[in-house]
Amino acid sequence: IHYTKDQNDKDILCDESGDKQVMMEWEMGYMKECIKRLQPKGHVLEIGFGFGYSAEAILTTPGVTEYTVIECSPEVWDRFEKFRTKYDENIKIHLVRGRWQDVLYTLGTFDSCFFDDYDYTNKERDRFEKFEYEFMKNNAIIGTRLGYYSTCEKRLGTPEYLDYDTRPYTTEIPEHCRYAKSVF
């Protein structure tokens, strides 16, 4: 994964080949709204760092005491290390290098979690459902909040042990964005 600019000089994150878009600047407002709706608290786990839009929203939310992010890209690790220096020394900030599939089970429990990884397989629902199962089994406690970024309009099923809430969010998506639908 590497950082670059699109044809409008806006930030964009692409895969190693530069052909597949991973994240674009237009997502900033949506990511911040996701975190606002999640209302994270306590020790927060984030899957995927990207540009740090959601991380910034998490770290500026009152009641967040610790932040851990799992990130698999070395280029993103470098950006994260610069990012972390801007935040309150009273909040413990951790970077776990690797894929969530390989490291999640080694971590403890969390009060909140935001899932926004890069989809290497194009099977978003399968990937999130696997994560949700593993996270709930190994890392959640009673009252844990779980939120995620999705361009899917509907969720196929919700486990009965979860309260599930979805509300639409409308944003302007640039025409040259190849990975998101025009309306969420």
What are these regions (language model features)?
Residues 66-71, 148:
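Conserved SAM-binding motif I beta-strand of class I
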Residues 1-15, 29:
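N-terminal, positively charged/glycine-rich alpha-helical extensions of SAM-dependent methyltransferases
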Residues 70-108, 112:
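S-adenosyl-L-methionine
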Residues 51-64:
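Conserved SAM-binding loop of SAM-dependent methyltransferases across substrates and taxa
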Residues 40-52:
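Conserved class I S-adenosyl-L-methionine
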Residues 114-116:
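A conserved beta-strand element that flanks and buttresses the S-adenosyl-L-methionine
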Residues 24-42:
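Conserved alpha-helix/loop element of class I SAM-dependent methyltransferases that forms part
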Residues 76-79, 83, 120-184:
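C-terminal substrate-binding/active-site "lid" region of AdoMet-derived donor-dependent transferases
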